[in-house]
UniProtKB/Swiss-Prot annotation:
SMART domains, sorted: IG (SM00409)
Disulfide bond annotation, renumbered to this chain: 64-142, 95-104, 187-237
Residue numbers on the Cytoplasmic membrane side: 285-328
Entry's family note: Belongs to the immunoglobulin superfamily. SIGLEC (sialic acid binding Ig-like lectin) family.
UniProt protein name: Sialic acid-binding Ig-like lectin 15
Membrane topology listed for this record: Single-pass type I membrane protein
Annotated ranges, domain Ig-like C2-type: 168-251
Family matches, as Gene3D superfamilies: Immunoglobulins
């Protein structure tokens, strides 16, 4: 009986102890899980939207914010924006802030159209682009550099795509010669979305007839060709997209000559007329010079000139009275 009581007492002591140990282990595991899933220290990161759209001629804002592991950094920093590709693309904007300053002095602004809107001290590198053009349609990458006690830098890898839209504009329209004395017309336009081109003219009727060239467009440029112009007159190229339309015209007037024999006779007649005209001019000049020679007085002979000289000499020296002779 005493042995049974002793065994029951041992079991009563062991069970609470085991329960306490298990509870302590579970608590420790919960504490470890809380540390793992808690927010880690700040790391480098860049937040940019995938795309920004704006119309040509307007302005666009490229947002860019970042985080970094260096808390309360107030040393010198540089903000940079690149175009085309990260790390190696050409810089379009750069500014630098001195230690403790929130003013980022602009060192580079391509064509004066890029301006920093954000404050790098507050982890904001947002950029404003003025007077957009179709050439600005590309990808841009923001970058920040620390150069104080901490030397560190970070740049966005994917960047933000700037999508520029534009109404169509015809940049060239011309008529070019083709083999076999034929002519063809070319029309080149730009726009985004790429415009659809159509030709209208005497040979195409009154309605617009779309004649798209098999040549592919280059970038935002699209070219349409009218391969054979069979009639003289006005040919109009029309470019249109969702933002508008544009038109330009070119005129074709061909010289319609006669047959071969008539053409030769016409050329010979023109040459003969020019020859007669030249002979008439030469004859008129010769007739004008002839009266001038007849009206010119003859030159007096030399003998008369000498006699008059002697006469003048005798008049200037009259004869003196004869000298008186004295006899011895």
């Amino acid at each position: 009986m005493e042995k049974s009581i002793w065994l029951l007492a041992c079991l009563a002591w062991v069970l609470p102890t085991g329960s306490f140990v298990r509870t302590k282990i579970d608590t420790t595991e919960n504490l470890l899980n809380t540390e793992v899933h808690s927010s880690p220290a700040q790391r480098w990161s860049m937040q940019v939207p995938p795309e920004v759209s704006a119309e040509a001629g307007d302005a666009a804002v490229l947002p860019c914010t970042f985080t970094h592991p260096h808390r309360h950094y107030d040393g010198p920093l540089t903000a940079i924006w690149r175009a085309g590709e990260p790390y190696a693309g050409p810089q379009v904007f750069r500014c630098a802030a001195a230690r403790g300053s929130e003013l980022c002095q602009t060192a580079l602004s391509l064509h004066g159209r890029f301006r920093l809107l954000g404050n790098p001290r507050r982890n904001d590198l947002s950029l404003r682009v003025e007077r957009l053009a179709l050439a600005d349609d590309r990808r841009y990458f923001c970058r920040v550099e620390f150069a104080g006690d901490v030397h560190d830098r970070y740049e966005s890898r994917h960047g933000v795509r700037l999508h520029v839209t534009a109404a169509p504009r015809i940049v060239n329209i011309s008529v070019l010669p083709s083999p076999a004395h034929a002519f063809r017309a070319l029309c080149t336009a730009e726009g985004e979305p790429p415009p659809a081109l159509a030709w209208s003219g005497p040979a195409l009727g009154n309605s617009l007839a779309a004649v798209r060239s098999p040549r592919e467009g280059h970038g935002h440029l699209v070219t349409a060709e009218l391969p054979a112009l069979t009639h003289d007159g006005r040919y109009t190229c029309t470019a249109a997209n969702s933002l508008g339309r544009s038109e330009a015209s070119v005129y074709l007037f061909r010289f319609h000559g006669a047959s071969g024999a008539s053409t030769v006779a016409l050329l010979l007649g023109a040459l003969g007329f020019k020859a007669l005209l030249l002979l008439g001019v030469l004859a008129a000049r010769a007739a004008r010079r002839r009266p001038e020679h007849l009206d010119t007085p003859d030159t007096p002979p030399r003998s008369q000139a000498q006699e008059s000289n002697y006469e003048n000499l005798s008049q200037m020296n009259p004869r003196s009275p004869p000298a008186t002779m004295c006899s011895p």
